[in-house]
């Protein structure tokens, strides 16, 4: 592969998926320092991507605006124009779906590659890269596409730089909530998009009480109405109320809260993966997804899998109407924490 000057990455959402793809941009810059990296992303992960110093240009793709004919006619041509302002030496479709294939189709490039498991006919546009990690962790699968265009991957680096002003605002929010600089605290990620990725609120509450007895403060994080409701349920079930930061921070401030914590605990969801990306000790509670593919990168030994024969089913909601992660008792998590030292 010749020198790369312009590379387009298509990885649209969600937060955890975008985090997993960040090392690809680092690998490109590490191998081709003068390369310009453009990334197409959807609004939910925009502020996360802005913290990536390895991305030179961000193109925003707002899928919602394309759902009506009027919206499509208004948005398509400006988006296409921005996408085609330059040609690319390579296009890497790390989403592997119809919507990302459509973006790759309109991008001007002779080399279009995708991940090993392309879906929705996206492999008709971008050639799947079936590398040595095709059965491995999703981070390594993404990196196989970088290797395919000549990138050396000497180490896996998640390039994330939190703006100083956002860290300062996060500190102020935390202090106002009762967490002073230097106070030890752990982060509970209370929700997840998939219902069966959520640990029961009574379990979080019991674990929070256990931490308080160790003089460690539990901090609840999340966003949206559902996470707010879950956090209130946890609060109501605890002996001492936790620090509740749900809906109190933006993504960049949340990143500071996570990076400064002693431990992050939650299901297979974006903020938990962010903890692993920062190298913070991370315990991931897993049911419908696979540890080897989706566990906390670099800390797979800290994942706790549910003891069910159907684990790794990849279903958003349990067809048996069972609460998947309730089979992970609080005592399992406490023992895992003790084993971490």
Roles of regions detected by a PLM:
Residues 1-341:
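Catalytic machinery of carbohydrate-active enzymes
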């Amino acid at each position: 592969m010749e020198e790369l000057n312009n590379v387009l990455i298509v990885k649209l959402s969600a937060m955890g998926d975008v985090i997993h793809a960040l090392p690809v941009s680092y690998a490109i810059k590490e191998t081709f320092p003068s390369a310009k990296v453009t990334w197409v992303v959807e609004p939910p992960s925009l502020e996360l991507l802005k913290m990536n110093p390895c991305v030179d240009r961000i193109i925003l793709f707002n899928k919602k605006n394309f759902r009506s004919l009027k919206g499509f006619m208004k948005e398509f041509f400006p988006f296409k124009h921005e996408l085609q302002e330059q040609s690319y030496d390579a296009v890497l479709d790390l989403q592997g779906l119809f919507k990302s294939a459509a973006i790759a189709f309109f991008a001007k490039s002779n080399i279009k590659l995708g991940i090993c498991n392309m879906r929705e006919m996206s492999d008709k546009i971008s050639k799947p890269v079936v590398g040595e990690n095709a059965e491995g962790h999703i981070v390594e699968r993404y990196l196989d596409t970088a290797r395919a265009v000549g990138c050396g991957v000497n180490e896996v680096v998640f390039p994330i730089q939190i703006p100083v002003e956002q860290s300062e605002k996060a500190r102020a929010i935390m202090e106002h909530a009762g967490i002073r600089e230097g106070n030890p605290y752990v982060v509970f990620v209370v929700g997840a998009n998939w219902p069966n990725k959520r640990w029961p609120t009574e379990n979080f509450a019991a674990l929070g009480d256990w931490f308080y007895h160790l003089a460690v403060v539990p901090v609840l994080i999340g966003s949206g109405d559902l996470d707010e409701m879950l956090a209130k349920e946890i609060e109501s079930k605890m002996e001492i109320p936790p620090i509740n930061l749900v809906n109190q921070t933006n993504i960049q401030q949340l990143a500071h809260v996570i990076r400064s914590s002693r431990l992050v605990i939650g299901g297979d969801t974006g903020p938990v993966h962010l903890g692993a990306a920062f190298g913070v000790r991370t315990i991931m509670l897993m049911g419908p997804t696979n540890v080897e593919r989706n566990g906390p990168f670099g800390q797979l030994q800290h994942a706790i899998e549910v003891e069910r024969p159907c684990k790794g089913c990849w279903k958003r909601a349990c067809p048996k109407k069972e609460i998947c992660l309730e089979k992970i008792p609080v005592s399992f998590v406490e023992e895992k924490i003790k084993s971490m030292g």
